């Protein structure tokens, strides 16, 4: 099952939301999030609902946007400003899911994996844009920049 298929199942049967394991990390598109919950008129409404839902479900919800929001089970949200619009290219969300899963596999806690994963992908997108253009970013090019992004973080 693909990640987006699981979110679509939740959208069609909202009672599945309550079966999401504690500490899970959800990364829906805005449209998927609206289908999982309700249609939101503004980004602020969507963010508010995501924060409430993350707290209720004791999970993490990542909403990508100009500033990517990482909604925490504590009822707070962290914002990452490292990315660019190139991250909306086909497959880039799958790269982010893979990076976060890889970090969890390395022993990172969910909150650290989510924040580091979002920041690494954002930094990789900026590195690509510095050499090319943010509009030309593909998922494979994002992957190609991850090593450089990680090294840059380690240097600081």
Specify the residue positions occupied by each region the protein language model found.
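Short glycine/threonine-rich catalytic loop with a Thr-x-Gly-x-Asp
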Residues: 84-100, 110, 135
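Phosphate-handling active-site elements
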Residues: 104-117, 126-131
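Hydrophobic, well-ordered secondary-structure elements that form the walls
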Residues: 3, 94, 113
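Short, charged, surface-exposed loops that flank catalytic or proteolytic processing sites
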Residues: 38-48, 107-112, 133-137
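Buried hydrophobic packing segments
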Residues: 96-104, 117, 121, 142, ...
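Charged C-terminal helix
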Residues: 123-156
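Feature representing long, continuous alpha-helical segments
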Residues: 48-51, 78, 97-98, 111, ...
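Glycine-rich phosphate/dinucleotide-binding loop and adjoining beta-alpha-beta core of small-molecule
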Residues: 1-82, 153-155
């Amino acid at each position: 099952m693909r990640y987006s298929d699981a979110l679509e199942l939740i959208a069609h049967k909202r009672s599945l939301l309550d079966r999401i394991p504690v500490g899970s990390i959800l990364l829906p598109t805005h449209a998927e999030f609206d289908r999982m919950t309700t249609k939101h008129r503004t980004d602020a409404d969507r963010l508010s609902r995501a924060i409430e839902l993350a707290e209720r479900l004791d999970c993490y919800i990542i909403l990508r946007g100009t500033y990517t929001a990482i909604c925490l089970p504590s009822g707070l949200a962290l914002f990452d400003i490292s990315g660019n619009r190139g991250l909306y290219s086909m497959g880039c969300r799958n790269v982010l899911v893979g990076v976060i899963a890889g970090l969890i596999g390395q022993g990172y806690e969910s909150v650290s994996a989510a924040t580091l994963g979002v920041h690494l992908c954002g930094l990789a997108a900026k590195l690509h844009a510095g050499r090319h253009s943010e509009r030309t970013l593909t998922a494979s090019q994002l992957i190609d920049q991850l090593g450089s992004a990680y090294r840059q973080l380690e240097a600081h």
